Amino acid sequence: MQETFIELVPRSASSLCEEMRQVEQMDISFQGYNLPELKRQKSSFLSPEHMMQMRKKAELSPEKKLALHLRTQERNVVENIERVRLMAMHGVDIALLVTGDAFDPGEEPATCAHNVLDGITVPMGGIEIAVGADLYMKQWGRWGHKIPAIQKGIVGSTFTQPIFHPQTLASLHENIGNFLPEKVYAGITWISNAKSREYWHRKNNVPAEFLPSGESDETIRYNSISQSADILRLVRQQGFSQYVMLMSGRLEELQQIFSLSENIREH
């Protein structure tokens, strides 16, 4: 069954709860939330442990599914596995293991996500384990190391980098089978300005021709919203689940993308 998740930025407990309240008042059908573990040198965000406690207290929309990211690189394998078990005890549905970006670009992560998977010998009860798929790296980065855990049924799903172009979506179909877990959540987001567009191209290796065109920020945003609506429609037509990343976008733009995707589908 297809599912739609909404990814929100957990800046604070109050802002997260308020955004959830606003999203649930919109005319959008979705099944869950995807909340990242973020670390920035000049910003603070809620930790997964804080969000677990909020979930246990029913402060995080108990009627919706919840996927939480776990950055693996700052902890050893045993500590990461214990965090997954803790998630299961606090009502989290999906543990998304991601290595995470290092503060120092030249720093090698101490523990990659696949190292944690190697330490899990059987599927864990009470929680689904997911991994990220970096669609813009050669051979999807370290993806080959994750395949054994997929084949053993330890990994149940993957959340992809945002898809900006149908050509990227086609690559998912080429790798269905032993290469991908049963459920794929295709990432979707939109770009608000030229600086953000440059970030996706330079930092995340998205081909420039896949990104929205435009000279002004207003034109880039308009084109990106339309492009994201097209991708959302295609993802649904092709049977993938999806998660839509709010990031720095506005809630009314999120509503617009869903509305446009429905309108396009009708024609």
Residue locations for each model-derived region?
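Glycine-rich anion/phosphate-binding loops
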Residues: 72-86
